[in-house]
């Protein structure tokens, strides 16, 4: 596995552990259907939480959350809509970003709640 893939997987594992420690129920990880993809689907207090995870070894060039641009937001919203239809979920949904910065399990985690709202298409 490529080094950046290993870092991404470790970051996602750290994000899941963080969410569980903070009372979130993890419904799915790396959910895919067709061309739709969601990193983490969680639930807490009757709310569905869609989490985009961005992992970087450092922030020399950019902050990880800057990688979540408008096209990525639109894809994530469409994927969340497909997920909710497939599983017949009718609760409020929130879109969060978790940034994971560091290496070798020594991570700094930042949870950005309500990081974005569904855009008007």
Swiss-Prot record:
Pfam families under this entry? UPF0102 (PF02021)
Q: What is this protein called?
A: UPF0102 protein BT_2236
State the SUPFAM superfamilies in the record.
Answer: Restriction endonuclease-like (SSF52980)
Similarity section: Belongs to the UPF0102 family.
**Leader peptide range in chain numbering:** none
Molecular function terms in GO for this entry?
nucleic acid binding
């Amino acid at each position: 596995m490529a080094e950046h893939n290993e870092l991404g997987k470790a970051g996602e594992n750290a994000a899941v552990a963080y969410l569980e420690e903070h009372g979130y129920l993890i419904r799915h990880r790396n959910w895919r259907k067709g061309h739709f993809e969601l990193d983490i689907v969680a639930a807490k207090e009757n709310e569905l939480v869609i989490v985009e995870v961005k992992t970087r070894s450092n922030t020399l060039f950019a902050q990880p959350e800057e990688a979540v641009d408008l096209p990525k937001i639109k894809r994530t919203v469409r994927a969340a809509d497909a997920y909710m239809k497939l599983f017949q979920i009718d609760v409020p949904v929130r879109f969060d970003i978790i940034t994971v910065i560091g290496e070798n399990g020594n991570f700094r985690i930042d949870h950005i709640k309500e990081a974005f709202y569904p855009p008007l298409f």
